[in-house]
Amino acid sequence: KAVSEKEVDSGNDIYGNPIKRIQYEIKQIKMFKGPDKDIEFIYTAPSSAVCGVSLDVGGKKEYLIAGKADGNGKMHITLCDFIVPWDTLST
């Protein structure tokens, strides 16, 4: 569940311009494969034009999310990752 979102700085590009990311605070319900500790935040680009993902915030919609962890353990998601609302999955 995505609880909240905010725009954060993620360093600078090669020209010194700040790189923005959307930081989603999430409530992890279950981990199928990944680190032992709960994921608290997921990062994505700020627009779908640069492969950013938009999640419903407020904690009502549950998602199955497959993303990538960077070297610092931060979880990142893009449009190419598997991200579907939980209630659309079949058994």
UniProtKB/Swiss-Prot annotation:
SUPFAM superfamilies cross-referenced by the UniProt entry: TIMP-like
Keyword vocabulary terms for this entry: Disulfide bond, Metalloenzyme inhibitor, Metalloprotease inhibitor, Protease inhibitor, Secreted
Domain NTR: 1-91
UniProt main location, coarse: secreted
UniProt-listed InterPro entries: Netrin_domain (IPR001134), TIMP (IPR001820), TIMP-like_OB-fold (IPR008993)
Protein role: Complexes with metalloproteinases (such as collagenases) and irreversibly inactivates them.
PANTHER family, alphabetized: METALLOPROTEASE INHIBITOR (PTHR11844), METALLOPROTEINASE INHIBITOR 2 (PTHR11844:SF24)
Protein name (database record): Metalloproteinase inhibitor 2
